[in-house]
Design a protein with these regions (language model features):
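Conserved class I S-adenosyl-L-methionine
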Residues: 10-19, 101-126
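Short alpha-helix
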Residues: 130-154
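A conserved beta-strand element that flanks and buttresses the S-adenosyl-L-methionine
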Residues: 76
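Conserved alpha-helix/loop element of class I SAM-dependent methyltransferases that forms part
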Residues: 1-11
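Class I SAM-dependent methyltransferase SAM/SAH-binding core
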Residues: 20-64
Length: 216
């Protein structure tokens, strides 16, 4: 997340769907001014217990953020889109309140782990029974539908089915592996491009008299 988001210390970030505060802690360690939002008072209580007064916490929904336009330098939706009622509206709101970059982290629809979760949910109830999963391509299409052609970067996390070790760890962190669109977890950063509305201004103009005498 840090490599994609490239935050500057002292700037502000909103964690949308902060839950118990796992991401809040990581964002705070980056030197950011952190605000968290979640619809669950239970989750917010746990986040407050973990973070204390180091962050600001609000109760609210991703589809209707209680903040003004451009309130934050960055926003994060870390495993949030899977559980909201309207993912596209959640993205619109994130783009509205953010000035610079938005990080989106999701469980990959086409990863082997993602398929296993869906199959497991058929036979026993899990937290993922009502979750929506997304692929890298679906996220990019949704983003472009909402705000047009903007710079987008992404990486995935792959867990190779071989014994762990230094070589395996280095391989999993290599750029080639992280560019695999079938990794278990996908992280994407959207760079927001300012857009300006223009309108014609009435400028006073008086035509010269073509019949007037020439001077000189």
């Amino acid at each position: 997340m840090k490599d994609l988001l490239q935050p500057m210390r002292g700037e502000s970030v909103l964690d949308i769907g902060c839950g118990t505060g796992a991401c809040l802690s990581a964002l705070h360690e980056m030197g950011l001014q952190v605000t968290g939002l979640d619809p669950s008072t239970y989750m917010l209580d746990m986040a407050l217990e973990k973070m204390g007064n180091r962050v600001e916490l609000y109760r609210g929904f991703a589809e209707d953020l209680p903040f003004d336009d451009n309130s934050f330098n960055y926003s994060c939706l870390f495993t949030t889109l899977e559980f909201v009622n309207d993912p596209a509206q959640a993205l619109r709101e994130a783009f509205r309140v953010t000035k610079d970059r938005v990080f989106i982290g999701v469980f990959n629809r086409y990863a082997i782990k993602g398929i296993q979760r869906r199959v497991k949910g058929i036979f026993s109830p899990t937290i993922f029974n009502h979750a929506q999963f997304f692929s890298v391509w679906e996220l990019k299409q949704m983003i472009r539908t909402i705000i047009g052609q903007v710079p987008v970067s992404w990486r995935t996390v792959c867990q190779l089915p071989i014994p762990s070790g230094k070589l395996v760890t280095n391989l999993e962190h290599s750029k080639i592996v992280q560019r695999c669109p079938f990794g278990a977890f996908a992280g994407m950063v959207v760079v927001l491009v300012p857009r300006f509305k223009t309108r014609p201004l009435a400028a006073p103009y008086q035509a010269k008299d073509p019949t007037g005498a020439a001077t000189g």
